[in-house]
Swiss-Prot record:
GO-annotated biological processes: translation
Lineage start: Eukaryota, Fungi, Dikarya, Ascomycota, Pezizomycotina
GO CC terms: cytosol; cytosolic small ribosomal subunit
Binding partners and assembly: Component of the small ribosomal subunit. Mature ribosomes consist of a small (40S) and a large (60S) subunit. The 40S subunit contains about 33 different proteins and 1 molecule of RNA (18S). The 60S subunit contains about 49 different proteins and 3 molecules of RNA (25S, 5.8S and 5S).
One matching Pfam family: Ribosomal_S3Ae
InterPro entries linked: Ribosomal_eS1, Ribosomal_eS1_CS, Ribosomal_eS1_euk
Protein name in the entry: Small ribosomal subunit protein eS1
UniProt organism field: Aspergillus fumigatus (strain ATCC MYA-4609 / CBS 101355 / FGSC A1100 / Af293) (Neosartorya fumigata)
UniProt keyword Acetylation present: yes
């Protein structure tokens, strides 16, 4: 009988099987808070590795960017086609305090706006707010039929497009440069700038679907904790001291 390896015999494995550790057991859950400019403050939860050694959990959270639907932040389905970017600037306890980082349209909404027989007009401008945030605003507009128009097409002439674009840049520059980032966010939510452009260009060519389709944050000023806490409806520690009334008792030394 040939001597060889019998595969049927069960043989003990070398070494001990390594115990698998659940990666989520090393993570902590933090709440993401939106600024007070939005109706719904609780954005959601985010996970981060627990602080260990030189790795701090707060450092891992700062700078994270979350993309949230404006419909969820405003509790209104009419804003479902707009997305807001929020950046974590500060961590307090288990809360991540965020600030506005940008705005964008969903792809399906942009595709649905582009149609035949009309002119598309786009404009963009780089502007600095009063609190030194450098932003780039992108606007989009479409021509529409005049009242009692029989002609099917609504194409604007090149001179009219240039005049409309000039107006769009002027209005965006004026509206954004005269306010802070929080005030600009208040204007962007109800689309105040879009309506202003539509009204101002009525004499050149009637427009429809005028939107600020994108807001890009190019440069932020030096981080100010007090400004961020005010934005979240919180305040820093009060500098003024409070008078403490205390009964003064003169210390009597016993004679030696």
């Amino acid at each position: 009988m040939a001597v060889g390896k019998n595969k049927r015999l069960s043989k003990g494995k070398k070494g001990v099987k390594k115990r698998t550790v659940d990666p989520f057991s090393r993570k902590d859950e933090y709440s993401v808070k939106a600024p007070s400019t939005f109706q719904i403050r609780d954005v959601g939860k985010t996970l981060v590795n627990r602080t260990s050694g030189l790795k701090n959990a707060n450092d891992s959270l700062k700078g994270r960017i979350f993309e949230v639907s404006l419909a969820d932040l405003q509790n209104d389905e009419d804003h479902a086609f707009r997305k807001v970017k929020l950046r974590v600037d500060e961590v307090q306890g288990k809360n991540c305090l965020t600030n506005f980082h940008g705005l964008d349209f969903t792809t399906d909404k942009l595709r649905s706006l582009v149609r035949k027989w009309q002119s598309l007009i786009e404009a963009n401008v780089t502007v600095k707010t009063t609190d030194d945030y450098l932003l780039r605003l992108f606007a989009i507009a479409f021509t529409k039929r005049r009242p009692n128009q029989i002609k099917k097409t609504t194409y604007a002439r090149s001179s009219q497009i240039r005049a409309i674009r000039k107006k769009m840049i002027e209005i965006m520059q004026r509206e954004a440069a005269s306010c802070s980032l929080a005030q600009l966010t208040h204007k962007l939510i109800p689309e105040v700038i879009g309506r202003e452009i539509e009204k101002a260009t009525q004499g050149i060519y009637p427009l429809q679907n005028v939107h600020i389709r994108k807001v890009k944050l190019l440069k932020a000023p030096k981080f100010d904790l007090g400004a961020l806490l005010n934005l979240h409806g919180e305040s820093t520690t009060d500098d003024k001291g409070h008078k403490v009334e205390r009964e003064f008792k003169e210390q009597v030394l016993e004679s030696v």
